[in-house]
Amino acid sequence: MKTEIHPNYHSITVVMTDGTEYQTRSTWGKEGDKLNLDIDPRSHPAWTGGTQQVLDRGGRVSRFQKKFSGFLKKD
């Protein structure tokens, strides 16, 4: 196996949206870094049945809603 071509694989701490933490190994960040999640399987509408609102990051959701607001309306 070639040396020095693979990314550094190390332990990090992942912090879920509810504050729980778990250890995993990743190529993200540096050894011991904390990855704070904005959305995770416990809070994402796709896994929770869609009862929670989707975060509008950068106005993407509002742009989509504006663009397709009248798409399924009957005259």
UniProtKB/Swiss-Prot annotation:
GO CC terms of this entry: ribonucleoprotein complex; ribosome
Keyword Ribonucleoprotein: yes
GO terms for MF: rRNA binding; structural constituent of ribosome
Organism: Rhodopseudomonas palustris (strain BisB5)
PROSITE patterns attached to this UniProt entry: RIBOSOMAL_L31
GO biological process terms held by the UniProt record: translation
Protein name (record): Large ribosomal subunit protein bL31
Family: Belongs to the bacterial ribosomal protein bL31 family. Type A subfamily.
Keywords: Ribonucleoprotein, Ribosomal protein, RNA-binding, rRNA-binding
Keyword field contains Disulfide bond: no
Subunit structure as annotated in this protein's UniProt entry: Part of the 50S ribosomal subunit.
Pfam families reported for this sequence: Ribosomal_L31
Record-linked InterPro entries: Ribosomal_bL28/bL31-like_sf (IPR034704), Ribosomal_bL31 (IPR002150), Ribosomal_bL31_A (IPR027491), Ribosomal_bL31_sf (IPR042105)
Name of the coding gene: rpmE
HAMAP family the record matches: Ribosomal_bL31_1
Summary of the function given for this chain in its UniProt record: Binds the 23S rRNA.
